[in-house]
Amino acid sequence: FAVACYHLGWWQYDRHLAKAERNERLDEHYRGEAVPLGEVLTPSGLAVQDGWRRVTVTGTYEAGPVFVRGRSLDGEAGLEVLWGLRPDAGGPGVVVNRGFVRPSDQGASVLPSVPPAPDGEVTVTGWARRGEASRGKEAAAGTVASINLPEVAAQMALTDVLPDYVLLDSERTADGTTPQRPQPLG
């Protein structure tokens, strides 16, 4: 029994070190300088070590909103709001999670109103996030059950979209203004 406890103690310590290293890397990414989107999000997918990396991209919102049902923020139920952005530099589009809204006062069958994404060129800064697995649920028009990028792209009628997304931190229009947006998640 003592030998087993000894080995399990080292195993537990190794797990602690791995988690501490991962948490340190995530903290560095979360607070770090933003890098161009294409350095982190690629058509082959987000590398594990790049999760929560700050990215920036300039482009034009071209589709949305699509609402992610079954979300919560600070203990309140609601929806997250997704928009499709086409980068000015070309290449695949990227889905941007612009924030959180509470459900409509008229019930679950009515989607809430949200501030629109800005027209024209916008520079988005946020965190690279891995797309989610499909929950296999049929969703009403304009909604999805998870941030599964093929399902989101189908709801937005978008083609050529990256398999991962950006969680919005800030955005600025070409004239330097900050557009109105749903409640931030980051």
Predicted regions and their residues:
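Surface-exposed, charge/polar-rich loops and edge strands
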Residues: 1-186
